[in-house]
Amino acid sequence: MLKFENVSYSYPGSDAALENINFEIKEGEQVGLIGANGAGKSTLMKAALGLITAQGNITACGLPMTQSNLPQIRRKLGFVLQNSDNQMFMPTVYEDMIFGPMNYGLSAEEAEQLTDETLALLGLSHLKHRHNHKMSGGEKRMAAIAVTLAMKPELMLMDEPSSSLDPKNRRILINTLKKLPVTKIIASHDLDMILEICDRVILVDCGKIAADGPAGEILRNKELLEAHSLELPFCLAGPVGV
């Protein structure tokens, strides 16, 4: 599904942002990508999307990450941005959702059917004709996920999907992501969400993989997390003294 082999990348005039990254994500896995600010998570996501040209070998959805393969690869990948305003650019949710499928050759009727099916799956049918500027932040985040799913991606990459959400909308987001069968990579500082959704965690620090394994093991390892400037998820931290 996604494989990195000895992948490295440096921004001009700076140290390595990624250094000898190796991992393989298989179909159906739910992977949390964690690390402190500046650890390399965003750069890794950019490499997975083909937005930067890294050294080493990247294979996505069975295709080598080459310039000639990028159009095919990007049709198989879905990316949910941290800021939904940068993703929702049409007047209504419906228009956003049919835009991609129709560009890929579906008829208006087929695109609308796909839109209706996707919104029903997510319990968001009430948002179909909602104007984007009249939605709350949580509604817009959920709509952005629906727009991405309407493209029928084989692999979804998500950047801080729970950021800035109130508790109610965060819970709706988590419940939605848990029931989506598509393979997912979720980059987030929300370790409680990662623990609840993901079965595997990749911990990145200083552009290197510091740990890669079962989410429950890594996120319960207080010494490991603190060594890489992270803390236990709140649900595992216990009572806080006053």
Label each region the model flagged:
Residues 49:
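Helix-to-loop junction immediately C-terminal to a conserved catalytic motif
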Residues 56-65, 73:
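Conserved ABC transporter NBD signature motif
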Residues 109-127:
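Conserved ABC ATPase "signature" region
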Residues 188-189:
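H-loop/switch region of ABC-family ATPase nucleotide-binding domains
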Residues 194-196:
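A short, surface-exposed alpha-helical micro-motif characterized by mixed small hydrophobic
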Residues 208-231:
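Conserved beta-strand-loop-alpha-helix hinge in the C-terminal portion
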